[in-house]
Regions:
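C-terminal regulatory/oligomerization modules of transcriptional regulators
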Residues: 1-2, 128-146
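Short, hydrophobic-biased segments on the C-terminal half of alpha helices
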Residues: 56, 74-75
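N-terminal positioning helix adjacent to the helix-turn-helix/winged-helix DNA-binding module
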Residues: 3, 38-42, 55, 102, ...
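N-terminal helix-turn-helix DNA-binding core of bacterial DNA-binding proteins
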Residues: 23-69
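Charged, amphipathic alpha-helical coiled-coil/dimerization segments
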Residues: 75-135
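Amphipathic alpha-helical interaction segments
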Residues: 9, 13, 41, 132-135
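N-terminal leader segment of winged-helix/HTH proteins
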Residues: 1-33
Length: 146
């Protein structure tokens, strides 16, 4: 007898598979000099938001992760020469996140990898199925944030 289906179980299984596939994709070329998955996402986020200043609180909110987690990741990125945190003139408490040339080079490589990964995820799915997935994912997020 099969156990009852569970959305949570399916999402956890997908998350594990995605993590494993992404790690394989990124570790193949980078070896020891690579970035973590979260660092790659942050670099991409900062590039995608270059029209405005990006702060730690933006990462906390938009990635839905705790302050301590973001602090640790940003400290490591700073130590590894990927970002610089610069004070802003209008608020001494805030430090904007600026990418270094090293991070920009990594981003260029990552873009192609993410395109390949996204293509792999979408194999066999129609545009309608992808749109349905996004709609369901949005509803699940709202359910969990409530």
């Amino acid at each position: 007898m099969k156990p009852p289906k569970s959305i949570g179980f399916e999402l956890k299984t997908l998350a594990n598979l995605m993590k494993r596939n992404l790690e394989e994709c990124f570790s193949e070329e980078d070896g020891e000099n690579g970035t973590t998955g979260m660092q790659g996402w942050i670099i991409g986020y900062v590039v995608g938001n270059e029209h405005r200043e990006v702060f730690q609180r933006d990462l906390e909110k938009d990635f839905n992760i705790r302050r301590a987690t973001v602090t640790g990741v940003l400290k490591l990125m700073e130590r590894n020469g990927l970002i610089v945190r610069e004070p802003v003139a209008y608020d001494a408490r805030l430090k904007k996140i600026t990418l270094t040339p090293k991070a920009r080079d990594i981003h260029e490589k990552n873009v192609q990898r993410f395109i390949s990964f996204e293509t792999k995820l979408r194999q066999g799915l129609s545009d309608e199925e992808v749109d349905t997935f996004y709609a369901i994912a949005e509803k699940l997020k709202k359910n969990l944030e409530a």
